[in-house]
């Protein structure tokens, strides 16, 4: 009984911990501001605009180091996925480009080369210019009926290659020996979440997810993975690895690599570092919104990708296929999918927190590739702006969680020995995936 009382007595101290923002700021932001004071021992990460000839890491624009390919994440897609990775070049042929008020600025049929930073839709008035930020790719077909082009392509079972769905690789020089490799994964459709069995909510045409591998002097140091506009960062050594044969061009070599594993959630394609159920967007002990991951088909994006470098303003293709496609399409900052359906549309539904069909996402150059910190942006409840790089894998929960993940309960297992049971239930209500447990997990990684 005494240990139980003591446990409840110290809960307020854990609650107070969440309001101390300087305990866990982004390590790279801290290093840049107070490098000498903190004694990190490594030079600061620079934004592309700060790089000089003396601090440059890559020898020239368009150069993609071999270590970037060798450490490309492998992606376990969900075993019952419906919307698999897709080819942006094929995807674009099923759309025209419209403004928010449904004025067509570029009609079908489209090719990838038709996308750009802006459009002059009328010959009569060549000075009339529509910035791409104000446009939407608008489907010619009824996407509610799952046309074939919306479904994407499964990876080859033996190799993990997807012949008809190249990943997009954008490498950014961050100076002083640092290099960021952004791997973008494109899907034609995002199937949203179910809330208490109802849904899906938050569906949208087009889906861009990505991961960031940050290198220092050719060695991977950190891995960040996107999820619902936010994401999670890890120390690279903490993430699960899988052995794979190294490829030199299209041929296998004799070298064996250890590649990081990430897990793509069913429908939403959010990325996680473990198998199971993952609550998202609602903090602490609420699990109204959850993603699900498992060890489904394995995708190796390094076997088919389009590679570029980016210096904060200019995109440079890495080889012939990318040069043939051009780079203008990457400067398209509009929505890669339809505008949110009008409430009068019979396909549209509403629940108190979300619509069934929402705006499509923006593309790769809208993902803050110039950032010096690891995180793309912060969730609405992360008011202190923390971006911790975890030192251990954040485990999934639920029936999909793997046995060695302690039933997916994470730090909630601390409560198992509390007696009497009513006191344990009270502690679980407050702590299990609640404020105290969340805070402990957040600050300890």
Put a short name on every predicted segment.
Residues 1-19:
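Fungal secretory targeting signals
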Residues 18-205, 223-445:
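A domain-level signal for the mature, folded cores of soluble proteins
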Residues 206-210:
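Short, surface-exposed coil-to-beta transition loops
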Residues 214-218:
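Short beta-strand micro-motifs enriched in acidic
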């Amino acid at each position: 009984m005494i240990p139980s009382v003591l446990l409840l007595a110290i809960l307020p101290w854990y609650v107070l911990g969440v309001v101390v923002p300087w305990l866990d700021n982004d390590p790279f932001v801290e290093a840049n501001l107070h490098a000498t004071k903190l004694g990190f021992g490594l030079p600061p990460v620079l934004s592309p605009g700060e790089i000089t000839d003396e601090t440059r890491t890559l020898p020239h624009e368009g150069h993609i180091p071999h270590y970037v390919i060798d450490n490309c994440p492998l992606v376990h897609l969900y075993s019952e996925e419906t919307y698999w990775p897709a080819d942006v070049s094929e995807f674009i042929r099923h759309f025209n480009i419209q403004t928010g008020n449904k004025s067509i600025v570029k009609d079908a049929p489209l090719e990838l080369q038709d996308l750009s930073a802006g459009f002059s839709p009328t010959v009569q008035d060549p000075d009339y210019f529509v910035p791409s930020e104000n446009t939407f790719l608008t489907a010619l077909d009824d996407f509610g009926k799952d046309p074939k082009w919306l479904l994407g392509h499964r990876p080859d079972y033996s190799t993990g290659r997807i012949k008809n769905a190249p990943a997009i690789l954008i490498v950014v020089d961050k100076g002083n020996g640092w290099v960021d490799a952004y791997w973008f994964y494109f899907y034609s459709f995002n199937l949203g979440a179910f809330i208490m069995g109802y849904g899906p909510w938050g569906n949208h045409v087009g889906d861009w997810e990505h991961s960031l591998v940050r290198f220092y002097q050719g060695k991977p140091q950190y891995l960040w993975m996107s999820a619902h506009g936010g994401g999670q960062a890890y120390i690279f050594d903490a993430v699960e690895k899988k052995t794979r044969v190294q490829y030199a061009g299209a041929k296998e070599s004799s070298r064996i690599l250890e590649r990081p594993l990430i897990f793509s959630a069913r429908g939403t394609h959010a990325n996680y570092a473990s198998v199971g159920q993952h609550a998202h967007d609602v903090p602490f002990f609420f699990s109204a919104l959850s993603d699900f991951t498992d060890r489904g088909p394995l995708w190796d994006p390094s076997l088919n990708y389009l590679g570029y470098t980016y210096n904060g303003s200019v995109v440079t293709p890495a080889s012939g296929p990318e040069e043939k496609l051009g780079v203008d399409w990457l400067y398209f900052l509009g929505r890669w999918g339809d505008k949110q359906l009008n409430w009068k549309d019979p396909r549209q539904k509403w629940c108190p927190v979300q619509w069934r069909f929402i705006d499509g996402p923006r593309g790769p150059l809208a993902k803050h590739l110039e950032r010096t910190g690891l995180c793309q942006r912060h969730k609405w409840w992360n008011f202190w702006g923390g971006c911790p790089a975890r030192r251990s894998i954040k485990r999934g929960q639920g029936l999909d969680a793997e046995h060695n993940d302690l039933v997916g309960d994470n730090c909630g297992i601390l409560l198992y020995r509390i007696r009497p049971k009513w006191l344990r239930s009270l502690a679980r209500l407050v702590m299990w995936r609640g404020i105290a447990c969340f805070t402990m997990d957040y600050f300890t990684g």
